[in-house]
Amino acid sequence: MSQHVMFNAVLSSHPALFIQGEWRIGNGVSFEKQDPMSQQRLWQARAADHTDVTLACHAARAAFPAWARASLEQRATVIQQFAALLEQHKQSLARTISLETSKPYWETLTEVQAMIGKVAISLQAYQTRTGHSQTPMGDSMSVLRHRPHGVLAVFGPYNFPGHLPNGHIVPALLAGNTVVFKPSELTPWTAEETVKLWQEAGIPDGVLNLVQGGRETGEALAAQPDIDGLLFTGSAHTGYHLHRQLAGQPEKMLALEMGGNNALIVEQVKDRDAVVNLAIQSAFISAGQRCTCSRRLLVKTGAEGDAFLLRFTAVAQALRIGRWDEQPAPFMGAVISSQAAERMLAAQQHLLLLGGESLLNMTRPDSQSALLTPGIIDITNISEVPDEEYFGPLVSVIRYTDFTEALKIANQTRFGLAVGLVSEDRQQFEQLLLEARAGIVNWNKPLTGASSAAPFGGVGASGNHRPSAFYAADYCAWPMASLECEHLTLPATLSPGISFDLPKV
């Protein structure tokens, strides 16, 4: 796999779309990706316009019958070859992800490893969630099968540009769907390099297509009559827009995995540094750019809570931040873009103007970089707290008096992705399980910890239940129920009102 650390301007028309098994130059506007740390151009190409998107969808539609009729073993062979190529190019792809996202190299290596692991998990999920089963019913058989939707559009996010779209593409292809993949315009290079591996793995022409671009490309794809469903991972704002765009089209499957305004409740625990480490991992890993990051840190009032916050603030202030390949390795890098950095600083200023108290001021050490330092704001005294997902290294502290109040505060959000509890009291966790309105409920584990072998997703503004991880299989195939009998015979007992005691013709 090539490593184009920086494209020259003459490569603005390099073929970055993959349609019908061919790399093509887009007909849309030229756009580029900059290194979040240095602002140097990493990648540049032309976006897909409406014509390109239509062509990609037509290619996927034409390829669908043969791919759907191929055996599961045939489809799995291609997907397993893709996994083998990921293993072979793990370091190269991890470097590409690090360059585009600014995530440290140690973190992007784990992302590529998760992409590899997704193949085996998807095979298991396909059999468990959407396989073939039959139940005897007297002289017949009740049979359950699953069938692919057809053409699925996959919209990928920028925070995990390899792992998260991979979590939809792999199960979609395994189930027999064909795919049109639209990655985030902030991570086009990772998508391009990943699709090259699919091509090398032998994916048939038209089965997987790549369209690059921003909002216009996404809207064109969502509006295509040739798609049968759409799998989306990203912000609630964009997810709501897609939901409105597909309104009135119940024939199209729409799966939305969006963000969260997640709460981490901190009760008393003996090992204070263990709690601080968990809170740091929950709030600031990936520079706070995970949908499960804790945006709200609920800390009990009193001396123990005060001591925890002092230690938490000190450790956050001392976190090593920097370029993805620096040594010693940083804990976190920059946010995805200068615009994202500006939005985070504006969010901090807004909370301070509302009456928040800064415990640790988030700063931008270099105006020419998207690198931010961690920020902590006590918003306990704000009367009307904005219910927003601030997607970056900024966490809000809310003090509470008792556990009942903490539960109430945790549920005061339109989102419902994740909530966590740090406590040595099992009964408190049992109460949280009963009252939490969230798809992920963790106990003494970071909010950002999740298993690909479990469902992933949330309720409310966090999405329509579990379209990611193990349950992604559910959204990639529809159930077909059959009653089957090999030999038709007249029943021994007829329904009332029916008689065959008639002269035969």
Curated annotation (Swiss-Prot):
Positions bound to NAD(+): 234-239
Keyword set includes Oxidoreductase: yes
Functional summary from the UniProt entry: Catalyzes the NAD-dependent reduction of succinylglutamate semialdehyde into succinylglutamate.
Pfam (any one): Aldedh
Keyword NAD: yes
Lineage: Bacteria, Pseudomonadati, Pseudomonadota, Gammaproteobacteria, Enterobacterales
A molecular-function term among this protein's GO annotations: succinylglutamate-semialdehyde dehydrogenase activity
UniProt cross-references to NCBIfam families, sorted A to Z: arg_catab_astD, PRK09457.1
GO terms under biological process: arginine catabolic process to glutamate; arginine catabolic process to succinate
Family assignment from sequence similarity: Belongs to the aldehyde dehydrogenase family. AstD subfamily.
Entry EC number(s): 1.2.1.71
Keyword vocabulary terms for this entry: Arginine metabolism, NAD, Oxidoreductase
InterPro entries xref list: Ald_DH/histidinol_DH (IPR016161), Ald_DH_C (IPR016163), Ald_DH_CS_CYS (IPR016160), Ald_DH_CS_GLU (IPR029510), Ald_DH_N (IPR016162), Aldehyde_DH_dom (IPR015590), SuccinylGlu_semiald_DH_AstD (IPR017649)
Pathway named in the protein's UniProt entry: Amino-acid degradation; L-arginine degradation via AST pathway; L-glutamate and succinate from L-arginine: step 4/5
Annotated catalysed reactions: N-succinyl-L-glutamate 5-semialdehyde + NAD(+) + H2O = N-succinyl-L-glutamate + NADH + 2 H(+)
UniProt protein name: N-succinylglutamate 5-semialdehyde dehydrogenase
Residues annotated as catalytic: 257, 291
